[in-house]
């Protein structure tokens, strides 16, 4: 019997959680509990409209006064007042005839903005200024209610004394603010409060002599709700944001953060929008880190971030992306919205460009800040000038001409590394041919590069050739076709077969004399080249290396193809691609076998996307090394997404030790094992009030978790609380290769809801983006 009772109780709970009413939209539920304006909205100045009075009885004293009793109703435009008794008088004043209405014994007032119930009211009918005693009020078509000892209604504001305000629905007193004086600004949509006390279920929590709160969707300056919690890394922490609405196009957020193990950190963000662009400037500053590992280091820890994008004078574009931190471990020690330790580096880029229909020119500078401890970092390009020219139908022929040219100066902080100027021109002519059966593109290209190299400043710096010329011609023939058939295993569906064949030729030239031989994981080859990751789409690239300092020889065929399946409405539901490169000669950049391709063919590369139905999607890619006869790289993602942010995602990625070693440069630290990681992400709105996000990434090779996160949110019409617990791999200085450290943290965030018209949305999206391995949408078919 006891077991059956538990069963019935469980069924009752589940029925409540998943009932139709509980799954209704939270915003609709909340707004259903507030009054709505149902009449026809009358525009214009209400003071110019006539006044209508109805009552059971009326006594008139000629043109001096009038008394109305019994179901009195006074209406002017959208304004309506109901009472049992009303007295109206008029007097001559220097500025004209003044009419006054006095209501006693209780009344109800409403317009398209507010509803009132009070004991006594006095209304100046000329100006409609209204003074009320002992009233309850409720905003119309939005949340917000309260009471006041006296209320003065004016055209632009409401002034209340000994007032109470809350956005909670009637019969819910979860939170409220009591103030000695409160002024609600109607047009600006904010409330000022003096001598305010914030209460939770009637219990005072804190007092402030002055407070501002938004009562609409307009941005307002003031304190935002805090975040607080605890972690192994920071200890107890508390951060209090303050928002400053400087102007319609300028605002700032300043957030002091206290960490019991580290001290005070000041964070700030400034946003701007101007006729010539928009941007964001941010900073984070900790004067001295009190953590044991940094206590004896007399230096600050800080971050500076600036992004700017603008278009001006019609043809000009300016872009700036700059992030710099005080030390390599900054993003390992601090959570920041402006970077992550998993990025590996911070960008510092500037670019200004001028565009015309057939050409463009750009001047830029870029450098990178590496987060790992390295003796030799990457080069910076300062300055860099790019010029591009395009001309289709050259001389009224079917030929297209394109020119890419670049001049760049490379510099390195290490005195061991050479400096260089690189001058590059890359003209190409292609002949595109196409018909309904397919397309053929024949392209010829010339790589012409000149280097002027200078030996490093250090005495032990290696010698380099001062002047180098490299000229490499290239020929590429690309053939594609599309074959379609409606004879598929699903009636009404269409399947295509799209073969793709490419031949590429480029002669060999030894390029080991370009740049330094002191390569490492971040320097790559030469000045800005590194081996590109290979996948199916990379099979048809012209080059194996990024940048221009390593252009590998090529004498190869690439053979691949894609099949697609379309449903009855013409929407793509499935695709599968497979391909491989066949080398007629080894692809080389120098005489080192380590930098050459092996065998007569590349790995098989496969890629696929499958929209199983409107809820289920699958994506995957795979590479099989034919030389080693084993898998080299693979990943897949399976996701169930029935509605909105309700998500269940399973992901897996694999990289063999040989693949990793082959794609890292010679001085990089070699991996001792394969990478095998399995991830599970769940985000679900259980009801309109409860939502959960859970994430677990497991390293199958190490048999240890990489990151774990559990977030739970409870929302009501007027408040919400979000609790998140995270455990993730972190690092410490001088740790050994076998050591693994975890940071454990718990964060709590509380929000007031119902102050704006559209602030009932949950924080599932925010919770999905938290952590070092955030949720990614990996699908091309939607």
Swiss-Prot record:
Localisation: Cell outer membrane
Pfam families found in the cross-reference section: LptD, LptD_N
Instruction: Give the InterPro entries listed for this entry.
Output: LipoPS_assembly_LptD, LptD, LptD_C, OstA-like_N
Q: Which GO terms describe its biological process?
A: Gram-negative-bacterium-type cell outer membrane assembly; lipopolysaccharide transport
Keywords of the record, alphabetical order, are: Cell outer membrane, Membrane, Signal
Q: Assign the protein's first listed, main location to one coarse class.
A: membrane
Q: Which GO terms describe its cellular component?
A: cell outer membrane; transporter complex
Q: Which Gene3D superfamilies match?
A: Lipopolysaccharide (LPS) transport protein A like domain
Say which domain of life the source belongs to: Bacteria
Signal sequence, start to end: 1-24
Describe the protein's quaternary organization and the partners it interacts with. Answer: Component of the lipopolysaccharide transport and assembly complex. Interacts with LptE and LptA.
Functionally, this protein is described as follows:
Together with LptE, is involved in the assembly of lipopolysaccharide (LPS) at the surface of the outer membrane.
Recorded hits in NCBIfam families, A to Z, give:
PRK03761.1
The entry assigns this protein to a family as follows: Belongs to the LptD family.
What name has this protein been given in UniProt?
Answer: LPS-assembly protein LptD
Q: Tell me which species this is from.
A: Pasteurella multocida (strain Pm70)
The gene is lptD
């Amino acid at each position: 019997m006891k077991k059956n009772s538990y069963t019935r109780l469980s069924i009752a709970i589940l029925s409540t959680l998943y009932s139709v009413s509980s799954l209704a939209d939270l915003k609709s539920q909340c707004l259903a509990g507030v009054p709505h304006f149902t009449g026809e909205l009358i525009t214009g100045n209400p003071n110019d409209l006539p006044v209508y009075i109805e009552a059971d009885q009326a006594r008139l004293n000629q043109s001096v006064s009038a008394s109305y009793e019994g179901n009195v109703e006074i209406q002017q435009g959208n304004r309506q007042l109901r009472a049992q008794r009303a007295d109206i008088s008029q007097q001559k004043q220097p500025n004209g005839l003044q009419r006054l209405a006095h209501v006693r014994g209780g009344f109800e007032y409403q317009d398209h903005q507010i509803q009132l119930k009070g004991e006594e009211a006095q209304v100046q009918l000329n100006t409609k200024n209204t003074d009320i005693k002992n009233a309850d009020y409720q905003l119309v078509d939005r949340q917000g209610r309260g009471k006041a000892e006296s209320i003065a209604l004016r055209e632009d504001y409401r002034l209340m004394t000994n007032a109470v305000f809350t956005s909670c629905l009637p019969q819910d007193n979860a939170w409220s603010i009591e103030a000695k004086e409160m002024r609600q600004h109607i047009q600006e949509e904010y409330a000022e409060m003096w001598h305010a006390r914030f209460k939770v279920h009637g219990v005072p929590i804190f007092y402030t002599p002055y407070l501002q709160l938004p009562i609409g969707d307009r941005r307002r300056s003031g304190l935002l709700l805090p975040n607080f919690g605890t972690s192994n890394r920071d200890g107890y922490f508390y951060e209090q944001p303050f928002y400053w609405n400087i102007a319609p196009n300028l605002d700032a957020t300043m957030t002091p953060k206290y960490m019991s193990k580290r001290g005070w950190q000041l964070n700030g963000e400034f946003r701007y929008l101007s006729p010539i662009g928009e941007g964001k400037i941010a900073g984070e500053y900790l004067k001295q880190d009190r953590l044991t590992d940094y206590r004896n280091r007399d230096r600050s820890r800080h971050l500076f971030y600036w992004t700017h994008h603008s278009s001006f004078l019609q043809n000009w574009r300016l872009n700036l992306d700059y992030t710099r931190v005080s030390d390599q471990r900054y993003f390992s020690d601090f959570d920041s919205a402006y970077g992550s330790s998993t990025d590996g580096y911070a960008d510092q880029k500037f670019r200004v460009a001028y565009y015309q229909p057939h050409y463009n020119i750009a001047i830029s500078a870029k450098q990178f800040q590496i987060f790992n401890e390295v003796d030799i970092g990457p080069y910076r390009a300062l300055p860099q000038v790019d010029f591009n020219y395009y001309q289709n139908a050259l001389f009224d022929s079917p030929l297209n001409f394109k020119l890419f040219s670049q001049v760049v100066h490379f510099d390195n902080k290490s005195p061991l590394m050479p400096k260089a100027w690189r001058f590059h021109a890359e003209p190409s002519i292609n002949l595109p041919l196409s018909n309904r059966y397919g397309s053929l593109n024949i392209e010829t290209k010339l790589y012409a590069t000149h280097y002027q190299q200078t030996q490093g400043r250090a005495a032990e710096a290696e010698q380099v050739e001062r002047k180098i010329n490299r000229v490499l011609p290239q020929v590429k023939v690309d053939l594609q076709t599309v074959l379609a058939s409606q004879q598929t295993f699903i009636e009404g569906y269409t399947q295509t077969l799209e073969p793709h064949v490419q031949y590429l030729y480029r002669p060999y030239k030894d390029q080991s004399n370009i740049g330094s031989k002191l390569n490492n994981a971040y320097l790559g080859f030469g000045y800005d080249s590194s081996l590109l990751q290979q996948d199916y789409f990379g099979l048809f690239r012209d080059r194996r290396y990024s940048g221009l300092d390593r252009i590998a020889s090529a004498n190869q065929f690439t053979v691949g193809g894609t099949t697609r399946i379309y449903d009855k409405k013409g929407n793509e539901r499935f695709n599968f691609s497979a391909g491989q490169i066949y080398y007629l000669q080894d692809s080389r950049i120098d005489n080192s076998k380590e930098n050459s391709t092996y065998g007569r063919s590349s790995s098989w590369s496969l890629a696929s996307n499958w929209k199983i139905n409107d809820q289920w999607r699958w994506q995957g890619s795979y590479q099989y090394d034919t030389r080693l006869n084993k898998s080299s790289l693979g990943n897949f993602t399976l996701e169930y997404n029935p509605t909105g942010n309700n998500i269940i995602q399973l992901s897996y990625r694999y990289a063999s030790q040989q693949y990793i070693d082959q794609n890292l440069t010679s001085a990089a630290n070699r991996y001792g094992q394969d990478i095998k990681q399995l991830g599970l992400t769940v985000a679900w709105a259980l009801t309109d009030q409860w939502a959960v996000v859970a994430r677990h990434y497991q390293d199958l090779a190490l048999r240890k978790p990489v990151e774990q996160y559990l977030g739970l949110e409870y929302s009501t019409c007027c408040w919400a609380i979000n609790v998140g617990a995270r455990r993730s791999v972190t690092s410490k200085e001088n740790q050994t290769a076998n050591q693994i450290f975890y940071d454990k943290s718990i964060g709590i965030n509380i929000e007031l809801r119902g102050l704006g018209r559209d602030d009932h949305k949950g924080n599932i999206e925010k919770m999905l983006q938290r952590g070092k391995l955030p949720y990614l949408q990996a699908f091309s078919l939607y």
